Amino acid sequence: MSENKCPMHHSAGGTTNRDWWPKQLRLDILHQHSSLSNPMGDDFNYAEAFKSLDLAAVKQDLLALMTDSQDWWPADFGHYGPLFIRMAWHSAGTYRTGDGRGGAGSGNQRFAPLNSWPDNVSLDKARRLIWPIKQKYGNKISWADLIILTGNVALESMGFKTLGFAGGRVDIWEPEADIYWGAEDKWLDDKRYSGERDLEDPLAAVQMGLIYVNPEGPNGDPDPFAAAVDIRETFARMAMNDEETVALIAGGHTFGKTHGAGDAALVGPEPEAASIEQQGLGWKSSYKSGKGGDAISSGLEVTWTSTPTQWSNNFFENLFGYEWELTKSPAGAHQWIPKNGAGKGVIPDAHDASKRHVPAMLTTDLALIFDPDYEKISRRLFENPDEFAEIFAKAWYKLTHRDMGPCTRYLGPEVPAEEFLWQDPIPAVDHPLVDEQDVTDLKLKIIGSGLTISEVVSTAWASASTYRGSDMRGGANGARIRLAPQKDWPVNQPEQLAKVLKVLESIQSEFNKSGKKISLADLIVLAGCVGIDQAARNAGVEVTIPFTPGRMDATQAQTDVESFAVLEPVADGFRNYHPTQFSVSAEELLVDRAQLLTLTAPEMTVLIGGLRVLDTNADQSKTGVLTARPEFLTNDFFVNLLDMGTTWKPTSKAEDRFEGVDRVSGQPKWTASRVDLIFGSNSQLRALAEVYASSDAQLRFIDDFIAAWTKVMNLDRFDLR
């Protein structure tokens, strides 16, 4: 058959909608990871499957693998441990605090772009090495869990005592479309910087395709002082302080080596660009054998210690024990060796017992002694190796578990008993939960409290909508909305919030005197449900709003103010809160927040319509409140938005505020934001708005709003799943 008669032209990649309209709103990020791409089926429960796993047997198999060197990819120093530590580190190390995305929690290293990042050269081989073990234990252990467990076993096999391991990471089955890795279109480019050295939010790596920093120094400039600046910024953006940063770098570089045996130009394309016969592997090298002593990954050729497969203090011993001078690897990369020929014969060769080498360091290693603050920490850990081991163990555990959410999600026999502040602890339920009659009595108290529908709904939404599905932080459980920093966030209307909380705390105190107890976290959510119930009744519809007690109240001591500060919304389209003009549009920020709330496009749409008519704007303005009867749960927002009797015009230079006027008389009718108008402008969102604007849609609208509301209220109720 000739090519022009082929019935499958789409396989060649035709022009897409985004090719025609690059600024088209990305709603596809709201519909990822569905049952359509997941082979496991809706009835598969990974937590239950993991509980049936013989973890000790898996670890024993991994331990045997560590020294079972394969001809197709020989182990450095006869031990795969350092390679597997790098695999686990680079899986977890993509996490960033800004939006909670990245990290080890989904097994995303198997997919583009991470599987093909320049910083992940040869990790395709690491995953193939553990495939027989994944194959053996099947669905009882996810790739995400196995990758981190392998890193732990690697450390243990080389004499290090880890803090523990928790399972519970659920695999995804397609690349993540929601994560913004940067605007660059070339590997290792750094358009993400502006000004002096201001890194774009929420990014936490210095260049496209790197996990953290350039090991040669900023943009390849071998300046340890400048490297320290980058290290401090990037590690802080993944929740590590200076002490943890030093311990992680020194601990990780106690093991193994880097690979730069020859010219990096001889390395072939990454896995996503490699030929089909390579079967998902990439970076095929034509330099000599391309493996073992001929391997090329970063282009650096560094072995830090004389004990590369054994935990020791030798990294610090060498770092402080020599004066260093700049040199280049065989691949031409900047690295450092001892001055005046010192250190000859100290370092073993990774594949030839007859060869010896000098110690070598990266520019980023030297930053640990050039930067004054890092130097103090490095010297202390050098002089106190037991403290070094303890800090590294805790930092490694944090690194590999930071994106798993609360400890209640942790699975397995190796979960540490200690709970850490970075895990956002919440006390366990210590009292009988309220029953149906108690809930009825409390509802009557709330109704009679004088609080408005808008006030209680706004407060419940503010409490629950901090949740991020990316790292499972935030949410209504813990009632942290009453604590710093959340109580002072402008988006939460601190004055109104204080008023509502005072009333609810009074109701709670009175109820708890009866011998039964309800947490403020539960009461805040219940009050929101009462508000919706009243609003539906105002609209002539009797409804039952699901409410499940079981939340508890965290204390200020259990709340890291700095850590929680990153959860503050810079914008919240659900509350029409847009205090700052960004290069990203308000509607894009809305979709991003909806994705973090794990909402679909229909759920996002119905929530916007409901929250608007319930009058919940953060500034108490009437922007987007497209109804003459606020606090009535009606579909008025959609009806009036799609009314062809209204025309819209911008009222601000930035075109982020609009006025709707009568098409005939020109009389003002409404005001709206970009977030409001996008539901009439975007074709996909308009299609959804039309469903809810139809004359027969009122009951559907209320039912769908209640379902989406309940979902948000329970996002952090992992005990209900």
From Swiss-Prot:
Keywords: Heme, Hydrogen peroxide, Iron, Metal-binding, Oxidoreductase, Peroxidase
The protein's required cofactors: heme b
GO MF, one annotated term: metal ion binding
Top enzyme category: oxidoreductase
EC number: 1.11.1.21
Cross-link (Tryptophyl-tyrosyl-methioninium (Trp-Tyr) (with M-238)): 89-212
InterPro entries with a match to the protein in the record: Catalase_peroxidase, Haem_peroxidase, Haem_peroxidase_sf, Peroxidases_AS, Peroxidases_heam-ligand_BS
Cofactor details (free text): Binds 1 heme b (iron(II)-protoporphyrin IX) group per dimer.
Binding annotation for heme b: 253
UniProt entry tagged with the keyword Iron: yes
Keyword DNA damage: no
Active site positions, chain numbering: 90
Residues the record marks as site: Transition state stabilizer: 86
UniProt record similarity statement: Belongs to the peroxidase family. Peroxidase/catalase subfamily.
NCBIfam families with a match to the protein in the record: cat_per_HPI, PRK15061.1
Protein name per UniProt: Catalase-peroxidase
Species name: Shewanella baltica (strain OS155 / ATCC BAA-1091)
Gene: katG
